[in-house]
Amino acid sequence: MTVSAFDLFKIGIGPSSSHTVGPMIAARHFASQLQAAGLLGATQQLNTELFGSLSATGRGHGTDSAVLLGLAGHEPDRIDPDQIAPALLDIRSRQQLALLGEHTVRFVEKEHLLFRRKS
């Protein structure tokens, strides 16, 4: 069995890739599933809830940012690091999120991205 360095290490946004890569991929996958089911354009609101360690360390470890970027269609190993801050500023200041960069929904982070401390 051969193991490459790419199997051991994943490229992603930080400061904690363990709290960003998975959530970013999962958020993008969710939006992609909406698109595949023909529901992306009909989506009017999106609520996200984080639990466990993602909730406990989320903001400090960048999980919130990763979820927003994933829903917007970005991938952890493909996003230009120089575009992260402007993309997040755009989402947060306009309080809108373009799912997969295609369909815009109202997204007020304090209402629509919740950190659940207890399950």
Descriptions of predicted regions:
Residues M1-S119:
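Fe-S-dependent hydro-lyases/dehydratases of central metabolism
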